[in-house]
């Protein structure tokens, strides 16, 4: 490893210790590299504004930073273990190409605020993707709720048959859930949308840095004012972002559970397209819903990332190297979470209900609640009506149909009044 920015003259570097210090940092930094380049370009512009760089030096730095980004995207520049991290790679490249102008780029900043701004930009991108995917999932669910509003589906509590429900109600539930998930991701994006660049190591610098310029140039909504808080917010903002992602993957886990049950032979309510299943290495008859099961497992990875960062934050104020580990947590958490969410819209759009199996699973006792409510409407005290319906639950379905039960369910949001227009109006505000 070369280009240690902090190495002091006459002090030897122990290779094993340095390897431990670096860990997999430079590999993880590939996620943040383009954001670090963009922030370096904005920082250079700010330095030119206060006379640290000449216009000619700024032009050279801007050109080389653009070329570095292009080379990285195209594979001509590889961020690997010869560098300690992405920050040293940028400075080494600029110094190699531009000499003293490259050596000036770090004036007024620390790797502390450098990684803060790069990860902050990265989190904004990821949260926007969570919001977009959540909105896409909600729209698929809304469309299917409208199309299948009257399709009877058994309703369960405690995984026991309970009442007659509908595909419309099932889809509307997931639609509202993912509308909320989109809102939460957007709200969290607004929280993290503050610029820490220019806070240096966490105590500011004796330069009149043009932080207003870097805030605008990098597209931040506001300046993160306090250098102390800039360091305190590292981990805190990552935690908030993972919580927003976790809100979506938690619902993903539950919808995957439903689909896993519904595709089993014991239920057989739903047919999955073949591309969402795999086979067994020994049992020729098997079609395994592995995609659904791995979706269900995704939330565990997100929750683990959240827990890792939460445990890292048992620290006093100021920067601590412990926080380096937060990078791996967010990369792995968002990597797993977004990969699963990306598959969900198409999966939901291609689910096929099996109406004969759905209807066969609706038994007489599932009308007992209807009988009790109807008696209460007729003037019988509900508790008495409940007892009578319980005693006659085996015959409660006589003369009744699933469609009739659904048509009578007129409370707002229930089967006869799904209020999809209300949900659609909420969805429209997401765009």
From Swiss-Prot:
Coiled-coil intervals, chain numbering: none
Compartment(s): Cytoplasm
MF term (GO), any: argininosuccinate lyase activity
Domain of life: Bacteria
EC number from the UniProt entry: 4.3.2.1
Main location class: cytoplasm
Any single GO BP term: arginine biosynthetic process via ornithine
Reactions performed catalytically: 2-(N(omega)-L-arginino)succinate = fumarate + L-arginine
Keywords: Amino-acid biosynthesis, Arginine biosynthesis, Cytoplasm, Lyase
Pathway connected to this protein: Amino-acid biosynthesis; L-arginine biosynthesis; L-arginine from L-ornithine and carbamoyl phosphate: step 3/3
One Pfam short name: Lyase_1
Any one of the GO CC terms: cytosol
Main enzyme class: lyase
HAMAP family to which the protein is assigned, alphabetical: Arg_succ_lyase
Family: Belongs to the lyase 1 family. Argininosuccinate lyase subfamily.
Protein name stated in the entry: Argininosuccinate lyase
Organism per entry: Xanthomonas oryzae pv. oryzae (strain PXO99A)
Organism phylogeny: Bacteria, Pseudomonadati, Pseudomonadota, Gammaproteobacteria, Lysobacterales
